[in-house]
Each structure stands twice: as C-alpha cells, then as structure tokens.
C-alpha cells in the first residue's frame, strides 16, 4: 500500500454481546422474540441436535447501525476518501442485509450530494471480495466493517504496513463532533518491565505521538484553528518521513531487513 487505510469498526453487538452456551445432548434449539406491544411472538427453530454441540444467539439494533453509518460517511468526507461497507449479506440475508440497507438509506438521504460534491463514492461489497480488493488497491479508502470483521481486519492492515506502532485509533460519535484518540496498541507494560530490569528495549513511540496529533487535529477542526491542524499534520508527516528515511525501532527494522 502507498496510502493509509481506515478501518471503521462497528464496536457494538454481534459476537461481542452474544449469548453462547454448550448443548449437553440431543434436543431442539429455538429462537423466540416476544414483542412488548402484545403482538404475536416470532419463533424460529434453529437446529435439531442429535447429540452435544454448541449454540450462539447475537443481535444488533438499527439505531446503532445508523449511527455507525453516519460516523463512517463523516470520516470519509473529512478525508475526501471513498467509503466501502463489507458484509456477507448473501448468506445472512436478514442480519447483514440490514447493515447494507441501512447504510444505503443513510447515504441516499443524508450524504449522497455531499459525496458527489467532493467527487467521492460509497459502495457495498461482499466481505471476501472486499478483502481481495484491499490487497490489490493502493489504499486511500474507508472500510466500514461489522464488529468482528473490524477487529480482525484492523490487525491485518496494521501488520501489512509493518506494525501496530504507526497506527492511529479514533472513536467518533455519529455526528462527528466528539472524538477520542488513543494509541492503537494500548500500553507497553512488558517493555517497561524489561526496562526496569535494566534490559535493552526498542519501543515504537509513534502511536502515542499520533494519539496526541489526531486529538489536536480535531481540536483544531472544532475550533477552526487552521494553525493547530497544520502543526498536527506536519508532526505526523515528520514521523512518517523519519521512518521512511531509515530511522526506526526494532520491530519495523526486522520487517524491512536490508532494504
């Protein structure tokens, strides 16, 4: 890749709020929804077990999916980059199909003209097609993922660039007006304990620097402080140029090799 890639992860629901359990033996698994308004319940037979197995029920809500769509589209507008949503709606016709339909509705009613004015696009793709395309493209796009897909693909993309170190992590509200910026890799306790023991360490500081620069950039955006935004962009560019110039920590150096 020659340009950055943004993974938009819908950090709500699906496997991360699922109810899973062991099936002890033969029997029938049912899924049932009981409306609060007194209407008839909706019930589906999930499986007839002939012996022990496993089961899981997961969910999501329209309000959260719509909010995620708005956040992704706003992020794309900020960067002037196209936005892609990946699902497996050919298999999960109702579940993933809902993501696809709600994204399209939000785009058509709230963002279509804004994207057209900036000459950028939105498109839904099957997850397997999107993964293959991402491997071939040069970067420069926002990839909207369901919760589990975003968890996995963010690490794939990070390692594709060489390390989690130069990666930024930004949480954005649907309206784009509240931001939390953090280091993507969390803390480096293991490195610090080694340092306390007097051992040599090589810790990449760039994610921590970028956590501040992203926060400052958005502060500048909200305050219409162009100088602060320019400072943030220049500091990030200097960090990238430093790495590309050959000054880097051990993790990246091992991947670059003699190049």
Predicted segments — roles?
Residues 6-10, 86, 145-147, 182:
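Short beta-strand segments
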Residues 134-234, 241-242:
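Glycine-rich phosphate/nucleotide-binding loop
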